[in-house]
Amino acid sequence: MAFTLHDLAATVDARAASGGEASYTRKLLDKGAEHCAKKLGEEAVETVIAAVENDRNHLMAETADLLFHLLVLLKSRGVTLEEVEAVLAQRQTMSGLEEKASRKRD
C-alpha cells in the first residue's frame, strides 16, 4: 500500500503527542504557529525554485518537505487534514471560477 498524506498526518500527530528532544516535529510545534508558518514559507520558496530550475528530483524532495511543514502548521493551529479535505470536497460542487468568486473577501 502506498504512503499517503494521512499516513504523514498520523506521524505528525504521534510525534506531536510523544515528542522528546529527538523529535523535529515537536521542536517545531514548541516554537509556535508563527515559527511553523515561517518554515512553511521557506519550504514553499525552495519548492518554487526547484520547479523553476526544472529539477524533477529536487522538486519532489522539496514538495515532500512542503507537505510535511504544511501538516505541522495545520497541527499547530488545530486544523486536521480531514477538515481541509472537507473544504476541497465542498469546492468540487462548482466550477473553479464560481468557487473563487464565492469566497468571502477580507
Model-derived features: positions:
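Flexible "arm" and connector segments at domain edges
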Residues: 1-63, 67-106
